[in-house]
Amino acid sequence: MRKINPKKKEIVSELAQDITKSKAVAIVDIKGVRTRQMQDIRAKNRDKVKIKVVKKTLLFKALDSINDEKLTKLKDATTGQIAVLTSQLDPTEIYQMVQATLTKASPRGGEVAPADITVEPMVTGFPPGPMMTEFQKVGLQTGVEKGKIAIKKEAVLVKKGEVIPKDKAKIMAMLDIKPLEVGLELLGLYSDGVLYSADVLSLTPEKIAEQMAIGYAQALQISKASMFFVAEVLKDLIAEAKVKADAFAVAAQFITEENLKEFLAIANRNAIILNNELNKGNTTEKESEKVEEPKEAEKSVDESISEGLGSLFQ
């Protein structure tokens, strides 16, 4: 039978005791957290939380030894390199503390770019020499200004989603470019029989109020669309029904006391249109008569002259 390492057994026992005595226990991902940063996190929060970096297998043994079915669900949230936080703080306070550990950092190489990483035109603090070649190797256009290496043109070093190569990570560190956000990442938190996710704990009163307002508006829209009568939409539904009924009555030429004025207005408009059309026709006829009248006048004058001459010879 394989013997259990006494040191590991001690770690499991201490961890189980810490979890049992604490109001809350949280599992955090520590991937990317540098040693110095972890030391600073511990120093700043020494009076608030106890942070223990452990292997998953030891954590699982500690959870199993407590015999709390709900607590063991923390296993489902455990992945990657982890640390266990035990505290008497409320869940929201622990979440805020964890979020406060996030800091900007330059990559070391091998990380995934969270967004396009660009280098702006600048005058660096490096004198001309071998460093200029290093800049050019990663695709930067360089020159010399004021006795220093200058980046002449903006360039995208790494595109979003790409793995950051070590040579480009080195250049970012030299230029103090910090595209990464490094710190503790909350994976799961257990307190008073409830298992919390980071998404739940990230909700603020303002966010909750905003989401409630959005949900309320969507519920009203669904209620209207499905003709589900509730007090909140009843007035709107009645108003919409009246508008549709009025439009139907007009289309069917069904005259009521409410739409009489509208029918009169329609009749008036139609009368004006008809009158305009008739006036156009009369104007055309009069113009054609005016064109013919001179010919008739000329003809009557000739006839008068003929009649006058005829009377002289009678």
From Swiss-Prot:
The GO molecular function terms of this record are: large ribosomal subunit rRNA binding; structural constituent of ribosome
Alphabetized Pfam families for the sequence: Ribosomal_L10, RL10P_insert
Identify the domain of life. Answer: Archaea
Under the heading InterPro entries, the entry gives:
Ribosomal_protein_uL10 (IPR050323), Ribosomal_uL10 (IPR001790), Ribosomal_uL10-like_insert (IPR040637), Ribosomal_uL10-like_insert_sf (IPR043164), Ribosomal_uL10-like_sf (IPR043141), Ribosomal_uL10_arc (IPR022909)
**Gene3D superfamilies assigned to the protein according to its UniProt record, in alphabetical order:** 3.30.70.1730, 3.90.105.20, 6.10.140.760
- Which portions of the chain have biased composition (kind: Basic and acidic residues)? 283-302
GO process terms (BP)? cytoplasmic translation; ribosomal large subunit assembly
Q: What keywords does the record list, in alphabetical order?
A: Ribonucleoprotein, Ribosomal protein, RNA-binding, rRNA-binding
Record GO cellular component, one term:
cytosolic large ribosomal subunit
Disordered, as annotated region: 282-314
Subunit structure of this chain's protein: Part of the 50S ribosomal subunit. Forms part of the ribosomal stalk which helps the ribosome interact with GTP-bound translation factors. Forms a heptameric L10(L12)2(L12)2(L12)2 complex, where L10 forms an elongated spine to which the L12 dimers bind in a sequential fashion.
Q: What does this protein do?
A: Forms part of the ribosomal stalk, playing a central role in the interaction of the ribosome with GTP-bound translation factors.
Q: Which PANTHER family match?
A: 60S ACIDIC RIBOSOMAL PROTEIN P0, LARGE RIBOSOMAL SUBUNIT PROTEIN UL10
Q: Can you tell me which family this protein belongs to?
A: Belongs to the universal ribosomal protein uL10 family.
What is the name attached to this protein's record?
A: Large ribosomal subunit protein uL10
Q: Which gene does this sequence derive from?
A: rpl10
